[in-house]
Amino acid sequence: IMTEEGGMTYSGAGVDIEAESSAVASLISSLANSTRKKGTRGAPVDLQGGFGGLIEFGSNWLALATDGVGSKLQIANSLSRYEGVGMDCVAMNVNDLLCVGAEPLAFVDYIAVPTPSNETHSRIGKSLTEACMRANVTLAGGETATLPGIVTELDLSGTALGWLPAGKAIAGSDIRPGDVLIGFPSSGIHSNGFSLVRKVVSKSGMSLTEPCPVSPEHESRSVEFD
């Protein structure tokens, strides 16, 4: 977010974080009585600040996360470039499980389109498959919906399932001075903040088909693990 005077912000790009948070709070308050009794299989586990939802499952907990690629898809749609969006979708979900200490196990996708396309679906499918292989999760299924009266462009989201031993969730409450923090270099902005990115591109007069004004080849562009 640009904070200098005259700069651009998320709200200026059409994303009101406070309004979104308020809407989410209203949704959650309406769901308060929809859960199973504590101590039974499937009952919710209270985890403040977590991006994944936890439920009881015997001596273990199951973790669920759902997310989409966001407005980055508008760039992919305009360029007909879908090779990486499956990777984005899987990563957004499994990362939300990992940050609470859960091991991702399986993933399902949801694709909404105004008109189905064999070529587009094939490219997305290959991207999802590669992403699931890298994340070591099972691509368990999904749903494709043709919704010409609702969507005008392809939309992609997914849900990931993971597990962890009961009571072993990471919430940050056990962090103490002197603990070792491990940081990984980012290979880019991934799937967050693209409403602002598109606004910057539009205001600058640049085109998505022009050469990148900064070097796209950075040492942190790709991280390999043994």
Please describe what each predicted stretch is.
Residues 2-226:
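Helix-biased detector of long, well-ordered alpha-helical tracts
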